[in-house]
């Protein structure tokens, strides 16, 4: 930890009237943090964090205002959220509705915002030399927004579309039931999203002018004294200070008092109740919720963090360990959430098995047995000290945050913590206060708990409905004798305190990097059964590393049955390792295990000190694979539910899924996997695992604080295990591990695939324009098309035409092929939506042809900025390198090569490409359109919808059978490697 040094005052200081009333140069930061920080408070009360990073390739800013949807007027639910939407749509100084987003888009940036119960946050990122202009536009949100009548009327549709997107989301539904059950006069009970009914229809019926209410809300609450701003740029602190003073001093200080809610949200009768909720998806969960006082002031002692650490622990002796042993649960989470303004919740959430659902009272009792054990044991200083040590270690070696993430996190922390502690405060719980731990523990008792259970099996018993989402729920009181058994529970001998964490690293030395160290990953071992890549980090200078192992066996994706067996093997492996891995994860050492079409992939990342210990444990499990039959049954049922639940995912996700199913060479459909699950047995998984691990090819990449000698030693450990199998006798051939390929559409092709959906009100249209095989030139050209189209597409289809909340345009780059896709999720029929997409493309062709040369060059530069943005962390650099290795392309300087081509693209080249591949009658145009059609009808509709004219569907050839479609299509070639490296695996002797 160190103190940011004071900087000298700039010679071009603003007049004294523009001086801040407070300037702090003692912002506590991590020892290795090279950025400079300064805190300010302006005369209008605005708190500011300035971050100077001369080497940044992205600038960013965020602003939080400490008002959210809990401050909505009672007669206008959703007004705070609506206000957030409207600020993007024009200000007095910059009146064009899309002026802000256009500026950002042409400057390599983008923006977003979110409304929370107590806070609203706005943020953006942009090319460094465009920060000044972006800040000027951003500041006007909070000074003089327009709220034009036209935009107000239209944007209500976007808010409503966002709400309709969330209607089938169990997360939103359950949250709103909990709010609905709060005291009706408490702000926590409000409906924060808003919809057309609450923001248009009801207000109109009561002669309420919503635009006037928006203006009043902004005027009342958007006050500088409850705002926090964070800015990061390449400029000096003095230069950044000058920019902020000039642009943000105009925000009015209305001396707003931050709203607070010291009363708890639930009436006394709500405690001791069981709330049963019927979900859309087949999920089962139990939540034990305790309402607490606001604990924000105790951030330096963190009593909630101490209890969260123990109650949510996953090692031996934990609640989760005991519930898994009994077969009642798969997962458990615990944590405290402060409102920061009066109250909070301590929640324990249990993911239930089918058997667990029948033992809810027993599970709750086990939780209270654990809490009773904690009371009897009392707070332990050594456990607290271990948590302090972990936090100090995380802060000391904190990775460099992405600029936009940094400022977005900062403006939240600035609302809570002193400015000088804004960076360190989340890691600062180092004051030992056992009295606070005991006090909080005394609040976690049966008489102060709410029990919420979620399961589809409750449908017959639930006769109540939440008004906004229509979620069915029911309420019963917990029997008195049950409550008494919880209150007077005996200790459970299986529940114990966590043991000391053996994974906490002790060696933080950075290995010396040889002067002749290669710039890119190189192969240090290559045999028919094992290929090892290595690159020692010489950039981030942290005691961290990443290593990944890609284990391939062609049996993994042979058919839907084997695909399921592979998936089950991975699930069981992760399940077996869970207790052991939890301590490692607490010590910032993470293992991820993933199934993939060619087998499994596992990655270890974090502090380099104990990685080999974790690797050895993993190898033991891999090559001596065993299965607990009870856990097999539980995990099989969980996997089947996940396959069935796919049908309730968002329509846009379905459109993406079906496009991949249509174009990928070999892809098993969800229904094919579901049918094959009937054949998945305990013995089959066991036999599959034995066969899989007996004949493998493994590709490994080791990156970070690892020398070549250390990497060679790791390779030797893996090789020893592989040589003990049959892999060395009969290795996997290179041609058994060829990458998947993409089906090729021909010039002039235009196909339509249509699928019905009964779970969502919204439909979805995806227009996919295939653009050819991946090459540096094609890659950068489709990226440039995406760059130029993105903002105007959003502005036209979402902001102006209000087709729906989800509007996306971008590149689809998979399986060696490139393309552009436009996705719109809408209440309107996909055929109509596609017609509007085509109309936009046709209209925009003329815009591109008439585009001034300087505007086209701005787009090129914006794309170059995005492409050349450097990885900020070891893991990001590792992922970039490994992406090339996994795809077997080895083009480690791809971004630089593509940008070199980009610099040479003329406007005429671009217009010609757009006309050929994107425009409606382009000679090279290849279209595959996917429509997801809602089968729901609008229950609130008072008249039949007006018919809309659809002009472009007759040119599509419908796809009625996926197999038939694929049977008559060629495949694109696999992208060839950039470097002359032979394909991994054994060479054929033919």
Swiss-Prot record:
Optimum pH is 7-8. Transmembrane segments: none annotated. GO terms for biological process: defense response to Gram-negative bacterium; determination of adult lifespan; insulin catabolic process; negative regulation of developmental growth; negative regulation of growth; negative regulation of insulin receptor signaling pathway; peptide catabolic process; positive regulation of innate immune response. Zn(2+) binds at residues 81, 85, 162. Disulfide bonds: none annotated. Can cleave insulin and TGF-alpha. The active site is at 84 (proton acceptor). It catalyses: Degradation of insulin, glucagon and other polypeptides. No action on proteins. Binds 1 zinc ion per subunit. The lineage of its organism: Eukaryota, Metazoa, Ecdysozoa, Arthropoda, Hexapoda. PROSITE patterns: INSULINASE. It is an enzyme of class 3 (hydrolase). It comes from the Eukaryota. Induction: Inhibited by bacitracin and sulfhydryl-specific reagents. Its EC number is 3.4.24.56. Gene3D superfamilies: Metalloenzyme, LuxS/M16 peptidase-like. The keyword Ribonucleoprotein does not apply. Optimum temperature is 37 degrees Celsius. Its cofactor is Zn(2+). Belongs to the peptidase M16 family. This is Insulin-degrading enzyme. One of its GO terms (molecular function) is metal ion binding. The gene is Ide. GO terms for cellular component: cytoplasm; cytosol; mitochondrion; peroxisome; plasma membrane. Keywords: Hydrolase, Metal-binding, Metalloprotease, Protease, Zinc. Signal peptide: none annotated. SUPFAM superfamilies: LuxS/MPP-like metallohydrolase.
């Amino acid at each position: 930890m160190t103190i940011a040094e004071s900087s000298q005052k700039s010679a071009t200081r603003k007049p004294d009237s523009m001086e801040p009333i407070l300037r702090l140069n003692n912002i506590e930061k991590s020892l290795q943090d090279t950025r400079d920080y300064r805190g300010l408070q302006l005369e209008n009360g605005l708190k500011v964090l300035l971050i100077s990073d001369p080497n940044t390739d992205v600038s960013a800013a965020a602003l939080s205002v400490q008002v959210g949807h809990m401050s909505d007027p009672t007669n206008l639910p959703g007004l705070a959220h609506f206000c957030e939407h409207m600020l993007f749509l024009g200000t007095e100084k910059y009146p064009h509705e899309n002026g802000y987003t256009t500026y950002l888009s042409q400057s390599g940036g983008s923006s977003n915002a979110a409304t929370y119960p107590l806070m609203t946050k706005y943020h953006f990122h942009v090319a460094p030399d465009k920060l000044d202009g972006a800040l000027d536009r951003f500041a006007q949100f909070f000074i003089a927004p327009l709220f034009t009548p036209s935009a107000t009327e239209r944007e209500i549709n976007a808010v409503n579309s966002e709400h309709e997107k969330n209607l089938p989301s169990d997360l939103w539904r359950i949250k709103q039931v909990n709010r609905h059950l709060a005291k009706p006069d408490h702000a926590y009970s409000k409906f924060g999203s808003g919809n057309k009914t609450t923001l248009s229809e009801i207000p109109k019926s009561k002669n309420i002018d919503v635009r006037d209410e928006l203006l009043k809300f902004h005027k009342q609450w958007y006050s500088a004294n409850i705002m926090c701003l964070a800015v990061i740029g390449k400029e000096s602190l003095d230069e950044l200070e000058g920019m902020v003073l000039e642009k943000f001093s105009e925000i009015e200080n209305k001396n707003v008092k931050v709203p607070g809610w010291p009363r708890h949200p639930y009436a006394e009768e709500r405690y001791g109740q069981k709330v049963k909720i019927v979900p859309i998806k087949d999920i089962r969960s139990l939540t034990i919720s305790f309402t607490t006082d606001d604990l924000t002031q105790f951030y330096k002692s963190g009593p909630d963090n101490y209890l969260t650490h123990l109650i949510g622990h996953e090692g031996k002796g934990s609640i989760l360990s005991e519930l898994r042993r009994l077969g009642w649960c798969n997962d458990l989470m615990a944590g405290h959430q402060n409102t920061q303004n009066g109250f909070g919740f301590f929640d324990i959430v249990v993911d239930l098995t089918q058997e667990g659902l029948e033992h809810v009272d027993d599970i709750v009792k086990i939780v209270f047995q654990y809490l009773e054990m904690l009371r009897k044991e009392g707070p332990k200083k050594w456990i607290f000290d271990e948590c302090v040590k972990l936090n100090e270690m995380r802060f000391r070696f904190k990775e460099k945050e992405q600029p936009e993430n940094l400022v977005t996190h900062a403006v939240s922390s600035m609302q809570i913590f002193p400015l000088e502690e804004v960076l360190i405060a989340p890691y600062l719980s180092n004051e030992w206060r056992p009295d606070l731990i005991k006090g909080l523990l005394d609040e976690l008792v049966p008489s102060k708990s709410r029990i919420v259970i979620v399961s589809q099996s409750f449908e017959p018993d639930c006769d109540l409905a939440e008004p906004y989402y229509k979620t069915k729920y029911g309420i019963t009181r917990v029997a008195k004798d049950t409550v008494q058994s919880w209150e007077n529970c005996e200790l459970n001998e299986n529940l114990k305190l966590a043991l000391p964490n053996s994974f906490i690293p002790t060696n933080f030395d950075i290995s010396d990097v040889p002067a002749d160290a290669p710039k890119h990953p190189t192969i240090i071992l290559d045999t028919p059964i094992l290929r090892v890549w290595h690159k020692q980090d010489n950039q981030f200078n942290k005691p961290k590393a990443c290593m990944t192992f890609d284990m391939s066996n062609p049996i993994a994706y042979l058919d839907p049955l084997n695909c399921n067996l592979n998936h089950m093997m991975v699930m069981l492996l992760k399940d077996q390792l869970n207790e052991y891995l939890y301590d490692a994860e607490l010590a910032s050492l993470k293992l991820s295990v993933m199934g993939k079409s060619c087998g499994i992939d596992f990655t270890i990342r974090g502090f380099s000190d104990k990685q080999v210990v974790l690797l050895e444990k993993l190898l033991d499990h891999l090559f001596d694979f065993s299965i607990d039959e009870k856990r097999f049954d539980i995990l099989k049922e969980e996997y089947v539910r996940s396959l069935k639940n796919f049908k309730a995912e968002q329509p846009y996700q379905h459109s993406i899924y079906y496009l991949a199913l249509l174009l990928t060479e070999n892809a098993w459909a969800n229904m094919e996997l579901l049918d094959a699950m009937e054949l998945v047995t305990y013995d089959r998984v066991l036999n599959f695992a034995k066969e899989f691990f007996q004949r493998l090819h493994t590709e490994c990449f080791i990156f970070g604080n690892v020398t070549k000698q250390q990497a060679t030693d790791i390779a030797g450990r893996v090789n020893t295990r592989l040589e003990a199998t049959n892999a060395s006798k009969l290795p996997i051939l290179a041609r058994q591990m060829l990458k998947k390929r993409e089906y090729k559409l021909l010039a002039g092709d235009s196909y339509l695939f249509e699928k019905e959906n009964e779970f969502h009100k919204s439909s979805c249209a995806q227009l996919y324009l295939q653009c050819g095989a991946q090459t540096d030139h094609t890659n950068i050209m489709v990226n440039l098309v995406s760059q130029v189209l993105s903002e105007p597409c959003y502005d036209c289809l979402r902001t102006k035409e209000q087709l729906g909340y989800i509007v996306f345009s971008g590149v689809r780059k998979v399986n060696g092929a490139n393309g552009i896709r436009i996705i719109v999720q809408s209440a309107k029929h996909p055929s109509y939506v596609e017609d509007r997409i085509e109309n936009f493309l046709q209209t925009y062709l003329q815009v591109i042809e008439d585009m001034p040369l300087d505007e086209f060059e701005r787009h090129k530069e914006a794309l170059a900025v995005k492409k050349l943005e450097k990885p900020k962390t070891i893991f990001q650099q590792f992922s970039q390198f490994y992406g090339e290795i996994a795809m077997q392309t080895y083009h480690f300087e791809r971004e630089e090569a593509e940008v070199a081509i980009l610099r040479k693209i003329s406007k005429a080249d671009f217009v010609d490409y757009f006309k050929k591949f994107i425009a409606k009658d382009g000679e090279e145009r290849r279209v595959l359109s996917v429509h997801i059609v809602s089968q729901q009808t609008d229950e609130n509709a008072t008249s039949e919808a007006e018919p809309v004219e659809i002009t472009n569907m007759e040119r599509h050839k419908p796809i009625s059978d996926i197999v038939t479609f694929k049977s008559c299509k060629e495949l694109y070639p696999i992208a060839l490697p950039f470097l002359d490296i032979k394909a991994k695996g054994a060479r054929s002797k033919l």
